Structures are given as structure tokens and as C-alpha cells.
């Protein structure tokens, strides 16, 4: 089924608002950051572009330090959605149609972004790489993503689907990150 296929050559990672002053108050933040880092390492290995947004950085700070090295392009915003002219121009310039979304908060910025892009892009959200302050808000958003026909998977599913097989140098690197 085409809906469930991922293609690293047609993929962009959209890292939404994992920022210094926001991450500490998010549910399961360390778990989410660790899984997000594994996905971003996969993106680096396979040359998948990473677009990062920062929500009101004056108040919420920069992207958390451990993820900054993976950023390809960074866009600041005050809107909750990432469907902004600058971001959309970058996505169109890259020319890929699958957008994998990671970040926060699931029920606000992640939700509005997926809702606003789902008609034009294949949207994929990684359930273990998104979070909110309250788990109930995250779970409500995840249920809505499924209703929107957004593909909801986890980081291991994505990584192993892209790897396809064991034994490669990439497998050895990435399998260590997700243990």
C-alpha cells in the first residue's frame, strides 16, 4: 500500500520547536530527544534535509543544543503552524513530497502544521518524537492525525524501513542509537 511506504529520496525531516525553554516542561522529554536524535542521525547518513522551526526564540530560546548540529535550515516563527512562506519556499526548493514531522507541542504547532500540509504532502509523524506538556494532549493530537490520514509510526519503524536490511555500515551505526 502506497500510503505506508517511506522513501528517503523523497523525504524531508521537519523539526518543530524543540527549544531550550520549552523542552524541560514537556512530557517524556529525554525519551523524545533521544529518539529524535536517532532520526536526525539517520537523516545525516542518508542526506535527508532537516528543516527546523523555532517558536518565538526570544522567549523560548534556541533549538536544544544536542540537536543543533543536524539543522539544515532554521526558520523563526510566531505563528503556530510551520506553513509559512519562507518554510514553504524551502520545501518547494528541495522538491520532496514526504514530510516527517518531529517536535513539540504535538497538539499545537505539530498539529496545525500537519493539518495545513496534509492536502499537498505525504505527512508522517513519529509518535515517539513528538510531545506535549500533557500526555493527554499528545494522544488527542495523535488520534486526530490518524483521522487526517497522516501516517503515524515511530522512529524505529522509519529507520528500519529506510535501512531495509541488516549488516550495512549504516545499520551498525543506527542500530546502536535506538537500543
Predicted regions and their residues:
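N-terminal nucleotide-binding beta1-loop-alpha1 segment
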Residues: 12-18
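Active-site-adjacent betaalpha module
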Residues: 2-12, 58-179
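A cross-domain feature marking catalytic cores of carbohydrate-active enzymes
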Residues: 18, 52-55, 127
Amino acid at each position: 500500500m502506497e500510503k505506508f511506504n517511506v522513501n528517503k529520496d523523497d523525504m524531508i525531516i521537519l523539526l518543530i520547536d524543540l527549544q531550550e525553554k520549552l523542552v524541560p516542561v514537556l512530557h517524556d522529554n529525554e525519551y523524545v530527544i533521544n529518539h529524535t536524535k536517532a532520526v536526525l542521525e539517520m537523516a545525516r547518513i542518508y542526506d535527508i534535509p532537516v528543516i527546523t522551526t523555532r517558536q518565538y526564540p526570544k522567549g523560548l530560546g534556541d533549538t536544544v543544543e544536542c540537536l543543533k548540529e543536524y539543522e539544515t535550515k532554521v526558520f523563526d516563527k510566531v505563528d503556530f503552524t510551520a506553513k509559512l512562506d519562507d518554510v514553504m519556499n524551502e520545501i518547494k526548493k528541495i522538491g520532496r513530497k514526504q514530510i516527517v514531522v518531529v517536535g513539540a507541542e504535538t497538539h499545537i504547532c505539530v498539529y496545525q502544521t500537519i493539518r495545513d500540509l496534509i492536502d499537498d504532502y505525504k505527512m508522517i509523524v513519529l509518535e515517539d518524537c513528538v510531545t506535549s506538556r500533557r500526555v493527554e494532549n499528545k494522544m488527542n493530537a495523535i488520534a486526530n492525525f490518524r483521522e487526517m490520514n497522516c501516517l503515524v509510526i515511530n522512529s524505529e519503524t522509519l529507520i528500519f524501513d529506510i535501512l531495509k536490511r541488516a549488516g550495512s555500515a549504516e545499520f551498525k551505526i543506527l542500530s546502536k542509537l535506538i537500543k
